[in-house]
Amino acid sequence: MKRITAICIALLLLAAAFGCRNAAANTYTTAAGISDAAEQPAGDTPAEEKPEQPAEQPAEGQNTTEEDPTVQNPIATITMKDGGVMKLELYPDVAPNTVKNFISLANSGFYDGLTFHRIIAGFMIQGGDPAGNGSGGPDYCIKGEFASNGFNNPLSHKRGVISMARTPMPDSAGSQFFIMHADGDFLDGQYAAFGMLTEGYTVLDKIAMSKTDSADAPLEPVVIDTIRVETFGVEFGEPEVIR
């Protein structure tokens, strides 16, 4: 029963609205009855432990695009205001439009100065909201690239995986993303996972252990200085969006 409760809480906590018109009626900040979410962790996570990558996930810099085996996957660098750095390999073969969207936002400076506004130790850290409270976004949405929305996405929500937050509507993701602090396989097929942390697990752990209030908001702002994505000369173009 505890696991079922935790799953329901987790799904609600990840929901947020990001600016496209159809999502506006489903804004979630703090849902009633889930203030104890931090007491429902997805699993224990040792501070220095780095997870095994699922078979579907390539190693850093390894391309999985059949068309050109010489092309490297893009690498995102999240630099925190306090100097901490996290690097993630993005998988355009797994969630192509989601990756395009993240690259476009990051390299335009959209994420610069934003925060991780929702933090749950043993579950995930969530950021990328210009409103800072789970209700903001880039004034558009993108199609949800995950199994329950008719898209084959084999990437499992293991510790270190980055995925897109959304409202209960499947095509409502915009700019908000979350990074798993612990394994959360129960999210598989429901959210668009699109990359994996390759460096900076100690930074992830530090952020996840931030003191938070009853709404899982950090007591002190956890500020992103910049997010930039190295594409190694590959042009990904702009994402397909829903307005």
Where are these regions (language model features)?
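Positively charged n-region of N-terminal signal peptides that target proteins for export
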Residues: 1-4
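Cyclophilin-like peptidyl-prolyl cis-trans isomerases
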Residues: 8, 16-243
